[in-house]
């Protein structure tokens, strides 16, 4: 993709990874350095923490789908620019349409604000289900934030238990997400 300048500065396009039939889809902000090198979302320290979070609620990383709002790394890991989000959003929308998750989980400010079209801070959005185009969506803190603010891990644990419980109550659920 060369719709914005990020296509010229990236090493790899970081589209998404996981089960294309996943009932749970995580959406983050943008690839970081490790993700840009490996071409897969959430493989650095934040990704390792996300994997631990997924495993803590009894699932495997391979059972979920993981994507980002942006598919290319912003230079120096700066925040995504509004025009980059606008240009990249159709790809995320298509991913969500293809995966058809039963629950979305927005990780952090940019994912939450983009999907909910709001300026509200994550602290006020997290902990309860919202809706994105009819899909229940939980907002929680980004794993990178948790690496800097480990005292908020309990809040994310509470959010993820709500997601787990919601999925476990779905009719026709099986042992796999």
Tell where the protein language model's regions lie, with residue ranges.
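A polyanion-binding, active-site-adjacent surface
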Residues: 1-177
């Amino acid at each position: 993709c060369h719709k914005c300048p990020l296509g010229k500065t990236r090493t790899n396009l970081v589209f998404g990874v996981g089960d294309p039939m996943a009932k749970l889809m995580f959406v983050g902000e943008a690839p970081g350095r490790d993700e840009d090198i490996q071409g897969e979302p959430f493989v650095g320290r934040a990704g390792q923490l996300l994997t631990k979070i997924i495993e803590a609620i009894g699932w495997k990383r391979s059972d979920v789908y993981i994507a980002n709002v942006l598919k290319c790394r912003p230079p120096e890991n700066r925040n995504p620019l509004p025009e980059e989000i606008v240009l990249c959003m159709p790809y995320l929308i298509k991913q969500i349409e293809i995966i058809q998750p039963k629950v979305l989980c927005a990780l952090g400010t940019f994912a939450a604000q983009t999907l909910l079209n709001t300026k509200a801070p994550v602290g006020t959005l997290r902990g309860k289900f919202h809706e994105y185009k009819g899909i229940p969506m939980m907002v929680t803190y980004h794993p990178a934030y948790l690496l800097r603010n480990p005292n908020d891990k309990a809040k994310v644990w509470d959010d993820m238990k709500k997601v787990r419980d919601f999925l476990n109550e779905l009719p026709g659920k099986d042992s796999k997400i």
